[in-house]
Amino acid sequence: MARGDAGRGRGLLALTFCLLAARGELLLPQETTVELSCGVGPLQVILGPEQAAVLNCSLGAAAAGPPTRVTWSKDGDTLLEHDHLHLLPNGSLWLSQPLAPNGSDESVPEAVGVIEGNYSCLAHGPLGVLASQTAVVKLATLADFSLHPESQTVEENGTARFECHIEGLPAPIITWEKDQVTLPEEPRLIVLPNGVLQILDVQESDAGPYRCVATNSARQHFSQEALLSVAHRGSLASTRGQDVVIVAAPENTTVVSGQSVVMECVASADPTPFVSWVRQDGKPISTDVIVLGRTNLLIANAQPWHSGVYVCRANKPRTRDFATAAAELRVLAAPAITQAPEALSRTRASTARFVCRASGEPRPALRWLHNGAPLRPNGRVKVQGGGGSLVITQIGLQDAGYYQCVAENSAGMACAAASLAVVVREGLPSAPTRVTATPLSSSAVLVAWERPEMHSEQIIGFSLHYQKARGMDNVEYQFAVNNDTTELQVRDLEPNTDYEFYVVAYSQLGASRTSTPALVHTLDDVPSAAPQLSLSSPNPSDIRVAWLPLPPSLSNGQVVKYKIEYGLGKEDQIFSTEVRGNETQLMLNSLQPNKVYRVRISAGTAAGFGAPSQWMHHRTPSMHNQSHVPFAPAELKVQAKMESLVVSWQPPPHPTQISGYKLYWREVGAEEEANGDRLPGGRGDQAWDVGPVRLKKKVKQYELTQLVPGRLYEVKLVAFNKHEDGYAAVWKGKTEKAPAPDMPIQRGPPLPPAHVHAESNSSTSIWLRWKKPDFTTVKIVNYTVRFSPWGLRNASLVTYYTSSGEDILIGGLKPFTKYEFAVQSHGVDMDGPFGSVVERSTLPDRPSTPPSDLRLSPLTPSTVRLHWCPPTEPNGEIVEYLILYSSNHTQPEHQWTLLTTQGNIFSAEVHGLESDTRYFFKMGARTEVGPGPFSRLQDVITLQEKLSDSLDMHSVTGIIVGVCLGLLCLLACMCAGLRRSPHRESLPGLSSTATPGNPALYSRARLGPPSPPAAHELESLVHPHPQDWSPPPSDVEDRAEVHSLMGGGVSEGRSHSKRKISWAQPSGLSWAGSWAGCELPQAGPRPALTRALLPPAGTGQTLLLQALVYDAIKGNGRKKSPPACRNQVEAEVIVHSDFSASNGNPDLHLQDLEPEDPLPPEAPDLISGVGDPGQGAAWLDRELGGCELAAPGPDRLTCLPEAASASCSYPDLQPGEVLEETPGDSCQLKSPCPLGASPGLPRSPVSSSA
């Protein structure tokens, strides 16, 4: 079974089966499979005798998976199974043509109605339902010949032509036989597909009987035989000197693209004419068109560009005689989907837009299916742009499923499908409850509701939606309502109309379900117009008043009564009477003859009477000469249309006395309409614009045409006889108003809205407001808002909202993300362009995710290094990172140690940990709104201490002795220095806080008196000299190298720069007093981390010990001491600064002088002080060059900027970007990694040392 491809509108399916018998048993008919999908169609399936087919519902590819259930329909109705048509277990449909009881090829008559028809299937899946294309199943047939070949006589070298015609399914193959033998294939014998046989250059051997043979899968038929006689050339008088005659002219032909077509042209003349082809439009004939035989055109693969009028021209040689024949070729193109709709995923209450474009000839019509059923437009679902655009607003769960665009024309159909997934987030509020609508008047309704039961505290606003509850293509209107409002008065409604209201709640996460709709019927209003009257008098003392009921568009409710007012002429006395609302006429009795009365009517509803009609004047007949004057026609009624009035009536009393009717009408002027003072005569004695129109007595209806819409007209009808005209029946009323044009005719679409302004409402919502276009001639009915994340080019993520107002609250957005908005105006059946783009970012929020790619690595027995990248969803500018760690992960979180660092830091070192201990770490990030979640726990085990890290007993004893001696020397030096320089200018004091330029400096310090001579602890970490202080030349020359108390960054190779200190004089002066209060210049800003733990009190002792040991090694004297500071500071300071930019301030870091590894054999004896001082200095310089940056001992955190700790560069980041971890210990730009600084979380207090 073959199915039609995209180039064919209909695929012919020819099934050829054989009846096989074995051992006397009849085998089942052979089965052929046909695949039904959402594609080009319809498919044509033709079943021959004893043939079967299996129809598969192959919609799995479009449905993204096999269907869970398949249902079939035939001719639009549910399929009923029977012996020759039943469902297979896999959902396929099996059908076959029954066997003829007599074994003939004839179809069983009962099977025709049972098997033949249009079949389609529905595939039910988890996401929805898909409908297949249609398969047209027919039984193979072959009718009798409708045209048999005819005998003919042809001269030698002439052209013979036989033709036969027969109908069949599938189209029969035509062959020809001569003497009941199939004709051989010769260039002279041309068999055309339409059943024509042309014999060129006829010879005597061609004479004989010919017949046509038609064959298809149903049977084979033979035509009647036709005899061909061959005459000698010139023997036929009819052909001698014959003018040009076209024997077989081309015929108008319509084919489907891809089929073949032959345009035949056979001409006769003496001598044989020349035949040529041209196109009537002057275009050249396509090069793929070939000549079949000598005079026929063959288009093997017809395409739309082949369409046109082809002209066959036959010219008689050596003369100017010619004959022409023309025929039109029309090539149809089956529909092809040029732009298929795309699958969409939308949150609840948002807008989805499907776009479908199709081509074909003729232009295909588009229609939409939802879950296999025809889509019915309503207030939320609209089909725009000639069916090519489907817009669904206020999406709900009921809108999820598959949407199919079906393009159809006379050549076939095409289909494309797309799914709509409705995303419902967790934590959304439930639907508002107890929605009520109370009518306040004919045009106002009070809608009230209660807040949702779930997550009510998260609501940021509501939207109220309403539309007419009856009718099709109703427009849905909506209003945005504040969070604190639970009722709204809706105005400008239509009276006596049913409306449907529902409410949706919004939180920062999105929209709730729609509430249960509330139905309300607006109250009646007074009618907006009065019925149109007709007056007539059946006798001199009565006036019959008749009217037509008001249409619903004018009644504004149910008309329950009419009031008729009347009086004499211009007299002030007016009489009135009321009748029920179901009455349409009233007889006014006891009137005076031959008097002018004025009459008017008003209609009333439960709300009261509307405006009355214009006064209508009527003269009653006279009491004299009544035997000859006809009365007025009865029951005059006029149906007002926009440009015409249909006048109908009944004959007056005694109709035999009348000869006919005269009809007059005129347009009432504006001044007369306002005054209403024209008094008609009794028998048509006034001038009228048109008339009289004489009508026969049998006529009872006449239409007045070419009137102006919305104008007031007066109609008069009188009956006449051979004596005179009778009394008039008069009607006065207005023609219907022309429908208000959408706007005056304009060439362009409506302009986009003006003054579009976006304002951030929360982290997930933005208010968008605009105003109507400043200059437009188009009536704006609603607007479409298009928005997407800034810079996005993925069309599937662009969202559309429809708003009837001039503002809309757009929710469900991502925090701290820039969006771009554009607004489009819509007229009636006309869409304008989108306006300029407006950008706005949502407000920040807490981070949704913790810092990513947290890595821990132990550096020393007491130090662990952390490295991380920013959160993948920071939802704002990260102002600081939070580090929690503990050796017991079961402790409550508030008992863990909290460390913080600024938002532009991505690595840190934690010091003061215990060796060979398992620590648990987790990190969080914080924006200005608050902290986000912490990462999952990660653990690390610190390194184990080596034996060489501790000193032996002899070393400790030597150190203690050295410390005591050094303290004494230090005290003596300090005293001597103070005596010599009592008024020395002091250096700037050490600041107890980080300088603004160096946020990485954190200190715990207090001002105090100079250290006493017995001090055994140095509690300050000193700075280098200020930039404006210059040491004496001797100091520059005698500067020695020492282990530094300041540290810098560490490169990836963990190499360290040399640590150097300008050492104080070794003579009696103490360097401690001179440097204790000196403030070090800051080399550059360094990010800071704070700690809650204080370093042990032994820090100063360790530093002093290091200095004394080094002094013992160096052993060279000092000539001068550096300037002493007047104010001395006692402090414990942790400094982490980068001095790499200054050659005068080497990169320093707090370190112990004790090497981790045992001293090499060539190392000088530090305890005894024996050894060459130069050798000791060189050795120490080498050793200090390889030390770690972080010193064991004090429990502290050293924060390393990424530039120093790893090759991880973080440029200035913008919202919408994040950092992605890449190999090489670096993070590259991926999503927001904003640099910010203003820590706001509580930190552990920093205590000053006592």
Curated annotation (Swiss-Prot):
Glycans are attached at residues 90, 102, 157, 252, 582. It comes from the Eukaryota. One of its GO terms (cellular component) is plasma membrane. Its main location: membrane. The chain crosses the membrane at residues 958-978. It is found in: Cell membrane. Residues 1140-1175, 1215-1250 are annotated as: Disordered. Keywords: Cell membrane, Disulfide bond, Glycoprotein, Immunoglobulin domain, Membrane, Phosphoprotein, Repeat, Signal, Transmembrane, Transmembrane helix. Residues 25-957 are extracellular. Residues 979-1250 are cytoplasmic. Residues 431-525, 527-623, 632-741, 752-845, 850-945 form the Fibronectin type-III domain. One of its GO terms (biological process) is cell-cell adhesion. It is a single-pass type I membrane protein. Disulfide bonds join 57-121, 164-212, 265-312, 356-405. Residues 29-137, 143-229, 242-330, 335-421 form the Ig-like C2-type domain. Belongs to the immunoglobulin superfamily. DCC family. This is Immunoglobulin superfamily DCC subclass member 4. It comes from Homo sapiens (Human). The gene is IGDCC4.
